[in-house]
Amino acid sequence: MYAVFQSGGKQHRVSEGQTVRLEKLDIATGEAVEFDQVLMVANGEEIKIGVPFVDGGKIKAEVVAHGRGEKVKIVKFRRRKHYRKQAGHRQWFTDVKITGISA
């Protein structure tokens, strides 16, 4: 059984017991979270597709950890003009473990 849901402007395909990295959620580590924007649920040959969301579809998960990703370097450069700027960015994320899928 697997499902596709929406969180943080992105879509994720998950199955029960899987750990997924999402955009940062303001929920403490160890707490439960429920996603109701379920786009599709598949159970063997039976597939439910939402318009845009599946009626009664819910994904239950537990927050495992919060953190920051790898640093992305941003460079602005103009040749022959002695101009160079550097910046960096590290995106916050939340790891969640899927505990249940229902539709």
Swiss-Prot record:
Q: Name one GO molecular function term.
A: structural constituent of ribosome
Pfam families according to UniProt:
Ribosomal_L21p (PF00829)
Please, one GO biological process term?
A: translation
Q: Quick check: keyword Magnesium in the entry?
A: no
The yes or no answer to whether the keyword Transmembrane helix is present is: no
Query: Per its UniProt record, what InterPro entries does this chain match?
Result: bL21-like, bL21-like_sf, Ribosomal_bL21, Ribosomal_bL21_CS
- GO cellular component, as recorded: cytoplasm; ribonucleoprotein complex; ribosome
Q: Tell me which UniProt keywords the record has, alphabetically.
A: Ribonucleoprotein, Ribosomal protein, RNA-binding, rRNA-binding
Q: How does this chain assemble?
A: Part of the 50S ribosomal subunit. Contacts protein L20.
Give a short account of what the protein does.
Answer: This protein binds to 23S rRNA in the presence of protein L20.
The record's PANTHER family line, in alphabetical order, gives: 50S RIBOSOMAL PROTEIN L21 (PTHR21349), LARGE RIBOSOMAL SUBUNIT PROTEIN BL21M (PTHR21349:SF0)
Family (UniProt):
Belongs to the bacterial ribosomal protein bL21 family.
Q: What's the protein name?
A: Large ribosomal subunit protein bL21
Q: Which organism is it from?
A: Pectobacterium carotovorum subsp. carotovorum (strain PC1)
